[in-house]
Amino acid sequence: MTITMLKSKIHRATVTEANLNYVGSITIDKYLMDKANILEYEKVQIVDIDNGNRFETYVIAGEKHSDVICLNGAAARMVQKGDKIIIMSYCSLTIDEANKFNPTVLFVDNKNNIEKLTNYEKHGEII
């Protein structure tokens, strides 16, 4: 048996663009992807902190160090430029694997620069 666990998270990223006329996906700065352990074409869940929308899409790599967070295609209707979002990916692990696993959690500032990189979250605290 496997369970689904949080693998990677980019917390409070700022949407820099919303491109309705693109095929689909979310474009994420390749540097942020690498630091957060998110792969190109990986399925992610997006939570918009400003409006409460939750949806899934896949990732495409943006230019490294561009700080881009761009929702493309239909997903562009779910956000506004400037919204704060949480980007999460998940993995399937056995119970034994899950008990030893820690996700990669990336906290970013208003310009999508990394403030903190950790493998642990505690309720009410930024570790």
UniProtKB/Swiss-Prot annotation:
Give the record's keywords alphabetically: Autocatalytic cleavage, Cytoplasm, Decarboxylase, Lyase, Pantothenate biosynthesis, Pyruvate, Schiff base, Zymogen
Residue stretches in coiled coil:
none
**Is Isomerase found in the keyword set?**
no
Protein's recorded name: Aspartate 1-decarboxylase
Residues modified as Pyruvic acid (Ser) are: 25
**What is the UniProt remark on how the cofactor binds and its stoichiometry?**
Binds 1 pyruvoyl group covalently per subunit.
EC supergroup of this enzyme:
lyase
Q: How does it assemble?
A: Heterooctamer of four alpha and four beta subunits.
Specify the species: Clostridium botulinum (strain ATCC 19397 / Type A)
Q: Where in the cell is it found?
A: Cytoplasm
Gene giving rise to this polypeptide: panD
